[in-house]
Amino acid sequence: GXFGKAFXSVSNFAKKHKTA
């Protein structure tokens, strides 16, 4: 669902900014 998409987005964001 949309939640999975959002999670991936957040995961990618964290990777890009090396946060967590």
UniProtKB/Swiss-Prot annotation:
GO terms for biological process: defense response to bacterium. Hemocytes and pharyngeal tissues. One of its GO terms (cellular component) is extracellular region. Keywords: Antibiotic, Antimicrobial, Secreted. It is found in: Secreted. Bactericidal against several Gram-positive and Gram-negative bacteria. This is Styelin-A. It comes from Styela clava (Sea squirt). The lineage of its organism: Eukaryota, Metazoa, Chordata, Tunicata, Ascidiacea.
